Amino acid sequence: MKIALGIEYNGSRYFGWQRQQEVASVQACLEAALSKVANEPIGVFCAGRTDAGVHATGQVVHFVTSAVRKDAAWTMGVNSHLPADIAVRWVKTVDNDFHARFSATARRYRYIIFSHRYRPAILAQGVTHCYMPLDAEKMERAAQCLLGENDFTSFRAVQCQSRTPWRNVKHVKVTRHGAYIVVDIKANAFVHHMVRNIVGSLIEIGCGNQDVTWMAELLALKDRTRAAATAKADGLYLVSVDYPDHFALPKVPMGPLFLADDEG
């Protein structure tokens, strides 16, 4: 039996999604909880391996098990064995041809910036603080050049192992909600650190250090050293993963926090 789960987590205290020796990971916690409920070893496959400190409201995983359990066991039962900062949001039995990573057609991230002179306290681990005033409208205009198929070498981490830097950005929007600025971006896939590198350069434009045209110039240069520093992990969320309709996976609010699905 193959089962898919929707997973939400606060990544602040984890060394990323992927299981590693001697450090805490989201994958290890989830597999341990699932193994207890299934009463057999469970290994999971995810839609996107988030980095250390990155969060998710829309991570999708699948696993194969011989255990027969009610849906409540895979949701509430698993949640009872998980730490408070990881939770199962939904469960669905899927066809054998489903794969959390390889069946996905697009992924969507939201990056939240707290744009205020003073740092936040309540949301300190869920946003990235920028004390400089930011012009969200300039950031929005600058980001539009990213739409479509492009070579994202300028926004690709040096250690990225992807075979190609080409990605197809389907949606990008920058909006302000009071003191919060949200960068919302959806693509067929992302190269390593792509969203955080894009946000780092948009911040330079937003605070007036660079012109609106700088983003397009960086894209054309295909040179990571010419772009801004990588933005912090704190404000980044994997909010949704798209799959072909015939898999009929549950749809839940993307968030995070106060954000509606149609915002951003």
UniProtKB/Swiss-Prot annotation:
Enzyme Commission number:
5.4.99.12
Catalysed reaction equations from the record: uridine(38/39/40) in tRNA = pseudouridine(38/39/40) in tRNA
Per the UniProt entry, what are the Gene Ontology biological process annotations, in alphabetical order? tRNA pseudouridine synthesis
Q: Which UniProt keywords apply?
A: Isomerase, tRNA processing
Enzyme category, top tier: isomerase
Q: Which residues form the signal peptide?
A: none
Pfam families (alphabetical):
PseudoU_synth_1
Question: In the UniProt entry, which residues are flagged as the active site?
Answer: 51
Residues at which substrate binds: 109
Its Gene Ontology molecular function terms? Answer: pseudouridine synthase activity; RNA binding; tRNA pseudouridine(38-40) synthase activity
- According to its UniProt entry, what is the function of this protein? Formation of pseudouridine at positions 38, 39 and 40 in the anticodon stem and loop of transfer RNAs.
Q: Which family does it belong to?
A: Belongs to the tRNA pseudouridine synthase TruA family.
Cite the record's note on assembly. Answer: Homodimer.
Any idea what this protein is called? tRNA pseudouridine synthase A
Cite the source lineage: Bacteria, Pseudomonadati, Pseudomonadota, Gammaproteobacteria, Enterobacterales
